[in-house]
Structure formats: C-alpha cells, structure tokens
Swiss-Prot record:
The lineage of its organism: Bacteria, Bacillati, Cyanobacteriota, Cyanophyceae, Synechococcales. It comes from Parasynechococcus marenigrum (strain WH8102). This is ATP synthase epsilon chain. It is a peripheral membrane protein. It comes from the Bacteria. Produces ATP from ADP in the presence of a proton gradient across the membrane. Belongs to the ATPase epsilon chain family.
Amino acid sequence: MSLTLRVLAPDQNVFDGSADEVILPSTTGQLGILPGHISLLTAIDVGVLRVRANGGWNSIALMGGFAEVDADEVTVLVNQAELGSTIDGNTAEADFQKATTVVDGLEGQPASPEKVKAQQQLNMARARMQASKSAD
C-alpha cells in the first residue's frame, strides 16, 4: 500500500508519483502522512517536504501553500517549489548567509514591509539550503 503524491506550483508539476511516507511542513509543525491517513486539509509553511519512496528520501523546498490528504492521495498546491536534487548547495548556502546578514542588520528596527520581506527571504533561503543538503 502506498500514497500518490502530487506537488503542483503555478508554473510546473514538481512531483507526481508514489510514496511510502510524506512529511509536510505545515504551519503548525511537521506532519507525517502514511497510507491510510485520515482526510485533511492543511496550510503549508515555507519549508522542506520530505518524501520516502523506493527505500530513499527526497526533499522538495516549498514556499507556502495548501495540502489535501484524501484516500491515500496527497495533493500539495504551493506558490513555488524546487526539488532538492536540483538546488546547488553552495549557492543556497550563500543565499542563506546573505539573507541572514540582511535580517540581522534590521534587528531592533520597528516593523516595516522591508523587515517582513527580509524575513520571508531568509525563510525561503533556509528551506532551499535544507532541501539541497538532504537530497539523496
């Protein structure tokens, strides 16, 4: 028994295949999905989706969206997604360091659109870096 996983972004079908287990980065924490899971709809945070299939793990960086689980089918609709195996680890690390520097430079300043955008960029850079490092 296995799951069918589909990860869809507006510009591409990121993943469409079978999975033994899926770990989703929901807005309330990591959510593990196995065959036979109850139906649910959840918000997806910026983070890394992990897929166990064929004895190995794959990672996908997600940039927020929604996931639906129904009858062993997991459908993830996201704003943007990237397979961990296609992300250059050195570039992802450099982007993370750059985003960290920007956020650190804004610390202590009042809330502003610039500060929110910088934090979003940091979260996205972190997800890409983690997905690149955990790709098999």
